[in-house]
Amino acid sequence: MNYWTKKFTHLNRKYWNGKLSTIKVVVRDLAKDGAEGLYHYPYEDEEAMIEIDKNLTHHEKTNILLHEMCHHAVEELYEDRPYHDHGSEWKKEMRKCGFIGRINSKRGRYKTKAG
């Protein structure tokens, strides 16, 4: 298990009491994707996975991981599991993790409004 997958496990215990299934976390260059982080939904034979941009600081990677974990939480914890993108369920999970201020799809690197 790599460092960031272990970090996922730690944050899962801290914010979700370990309720989320552990998924693989990969750190790579996401410049071509134009993203800081990606959550891949489970589909057919593909398992869920999180990718984080390698060019971020450790602090930013941690917050991006939380952002993507909130997508995973909506997928696993909400009964209807609608395609949620950055909807109300996801925003609720972001606030649960300590993100404050305006919560939208661009929020991830920083938890506070100042960031």
Regions found by a protein language model. Give the residues of each.
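Metalloprotease/metallohydrolase-associated module, dominated by Zn2+-dependent proteases
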Residues: M1-E60, E76-G115
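Active-site recognition of the HExxH zinc-binding catalytic motif
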Residues: N63-E76
